[in-house]
Amino acid sequence: MLYHGVDLVEVRRIRQAVMRYGQRFLARVYTAAERADCEIAPQVMRYEALAARWAAKEACAKALGIGLRGLGAFTVDYPRAGLHDIEVVRDAAGRPTLHLSGVAAQTANALQIRALAVSLSHTDELAIASVVAWVDLSGV
């Protein structure tokens, strides 16, 4: 069985948040590893890289069927992961991967998710992320 989440983010929204709140926004939303990874991106693509990671966090939360704390009011009472509970990191080959902790990891374990795949893309205006979660039902 597969669970899928996708999210689209306007790069300008992330740029505006960084310009307005600076390091406070960056530290609240992104882990130290994510911030460091985006810092090595060429200056012209830094906001796109940040927006793609934001989209990945949202897409992963959607695939897991949970919300993200700090992203507005929810009318349904369900688990909400912290923004640092879903981390976008690179593997040895440079591909984006997801590292889960906290509520996100607990939910993935409860759903018996065996693997997560993330794909990121962006233009200068939009960033998109797609997350597929694979559940092995062969033992059921």
From Swiss-Prot:
Gene3D superfamilies: 4'-phosphopantetheinyl transferase domain (3.90.470.20). SUPFAM superfamilies: 4'-phosphopantetheinyl transferase. This is Holo-[acyl-carrier-protein] synthase. Mg(2+) binds at D7, E58. The gene is acpS. It is found in: Cytoplasm. The keyword Lipid biosynthesis applies. It is an enzyme of class 2 (transferase). GO terms for biological process: fatty acid biosynthetic process. Its main location: cytoplasm. It catalyses: apo-[ACP] + CoA = holo-[ACP] + adenosine 3',5'-bisphosphate + H(+). It comes from Chloroflexus aggregans (strain MD-66 / DSM 9485). GO terms for cellular component: cytoplasm. Its cofactor is Mg(2+). Disulfide bonds: none annotated. One of its GO terms (molecular function) is holo-[acyl-carrier-protein] synthase activity. Belongs to the P-Pant transferase superfamily. AcpS family. Transfers the 4'-phosphopantetheine moiety from coenzyme A to a Ser of acyl-carrier-protein. Pfam families: ACPS.
